[in-house]
A protein has these predicted regions:
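A conserved ligand/cofactor-binding region detector
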Residues: 1-291
């Protein structure tokens, strides 16, 4: 494995001492992604699909450095250059994909399954603004969008895309992935995050209030959008169906790639439904299999 300082010099033609904390963060993110890209995927005939509306995965930089077994090494390299790893960790935005115990449970499962070397992946949605970000203005609490996705992020784009049919329109998805590294393992799994193609941030009005009727443009804006009215209720259902349809189509495609004739699908896939949000995957799988 190339030393981080050598990686930085090769990619930037600068030393660690010459870079700002943010520049070091970007280099460290790319360094970790390069290492994880070389790791093979866990494989097996049968695969677990852990479908969840949320994944509270925490900050990924420190977690990935620990799982790769290089945390102390990086800390020492940075200290030698007069830099603080803890300051750089503060720059790393936490993916705003979860809220509480449900999301933390899901994250613990996909973390553990990767460490155990199981062929098992999470499937969810890529919420661009999360639940909300709490800020204080003039001694008052306000909720604002938590725009956590930066130009340089842990998301890995793919070419995978599916058509999800609704009553009056069809949405085309796109899939981004996050590498889930097991603790000191030479293999990895993925967290699969589905998204819409035409997200529109301009639908956000004040705080976290937004136009909930434009489903084609708002579906993956927020985690758990306000469902106190009819439009909010419908948006939640649209989100859940979009998630499970993509998950089911991914499951079927991957099972076929591994040799399934679909009559033996149970020998190729397990589905873990995390709470009620993904429960529509059952009728959706039946719909797809009877087409």
């Amino acid at each position: 494995m190339t030393q981080f300082s050598t990686f930085v010099q090769t990619t930037t033609h600068k030393t660690l001492e010459q870079l700002s904390d943010r520049e070091i963060y970007v280099q460290l993110l790319n360094y970790v992604k390069e290492i994880s890209a070389d790791k093979p995927k866990n494989t097996a005939k049968r695969k677990v699909y852990y479908i969840s509306a949320e994944f509270l995965i925490g900050k990924l930089l420190s977690n990935n450095l620990i799982n790769l077994g290089i945390y102390q090494e990086i800390k020492a390299e940075l200290a030698k250059a007069g830099k603080s790893l803890s300051h750089i960790e503060d720059i790393d935005p936490e993916p705003s994909l979860g809220n509480g115990g449900l999301g933390r449970l899901a994250s613990c499962f996909i973390d553990s399954m990767s460490t155990l070397g199981l062929n098992a992946e999470g499937v969810g949605l890529n919420y661009h603004c999360g639940l909300f970000k709490q800020v204080f203005k003039k001694n008052e609490q306000h909720a604002e969008p938590n725009n956590w996705i930066e130009e340089n992020s842990w998301l890995i784009p793919t070419e995978i895309s599916y058509e999800v049919p609704f009553k009056h329109f069809t949405l085309t998805s796109k899939l981004d992935r996050v590498d889930i590294l097991g603790y000191k393992k030479e293999s990895k799994n993925y967290l699969n995050l589905f998204d819409i193609q035409a997200l529109n941030y301009n639908l956000i009005e004040t705080g976290i209030e937004f136009n909930k009727t434009k489903i084609k443009e708002n579906l993956t804006l927020f985690l758990y959008p306000d469902d106190s009215d009819k439009n909010g209720e419908l948006l939640r259902i649209y989100q859940q169906y979009f998630m499970v349809s993509n998950a089911a189509q991914l499951l079927i495609d991957e099972a076929i790639e591994r040799g399934s004739n679909l009559h033996d699908l149970a020998d190729y896939a397990y589905v873990q439904i995390n709470d009620t949000h993904p429960s529509m995957v059952i009728p959706e799988l039946i719909r797809l299999l009877t087409k």
